[in-house]
């Protein structure tokens, strides 16, 4: 009797494993590149992007943006608010970056979107390349969905 119960329990376990729900894949993102032409002389910068429907516009620092200077350069933390041409949609990236004479590196995450970009999600990395003494091209690469 015990052997019959054990076989039945084993068969039930195998059967339940065979009918388990299939794994659901995490949605894949769409590659994105955003280039912000940042000038230290202006609060507003122009940008271009590969984001459909938001190929260009302007970007400003959010209210929580802070730069902390150190002997080796500094750290930027806070939001970058991107407004697409026309002003009807845009998105906000939260950026953590280190910077110095040679440029900057960091990571970013989408924290919000509005208009046609409401619900936007994504993340990636940043490389900043100095183009003059007062300007840098911030290149954001990653994926969005």
Regions found by a protein language model. Give the residues of each.
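C-terminal region of N-terminal signal peptides and the immediate post-cleavage residues
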Residues: 4-7, 15-33
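Beta-strand-enriched cores of mature, soluble protein domains
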Residues: 24-145
């Amino acid at each position: 009797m015990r052997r019959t119960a054990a076989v039945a329990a084993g068969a039930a376990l195998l059967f339940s494993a065979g009918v388990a729900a299939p794994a659901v894949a995490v949605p894949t993102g769409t590659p994105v590149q955003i280039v912000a032409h940042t000038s230290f002389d202006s609060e507003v910068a122009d940008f271009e992007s590969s984001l459909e429907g938001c190929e260009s516009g302007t970007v400003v620092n959010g209210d929580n943006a802070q730069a902390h200077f150190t002997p080796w350069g500094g750290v930027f933390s806070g939001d970058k608010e991107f407004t697409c041409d026309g002003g009807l949609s845009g998105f906000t990236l939260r950026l953590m970056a280190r910077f110095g004479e040679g440029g900057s590196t960091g990571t970013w995450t989408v924290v919000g979107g509005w208009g046609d970009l409401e619900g936007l999600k994504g993340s990636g990395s940043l490389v900043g390349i100095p183009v003059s003494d007062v300007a840098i091209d911030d290149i954001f690469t990653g994926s969005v969905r």
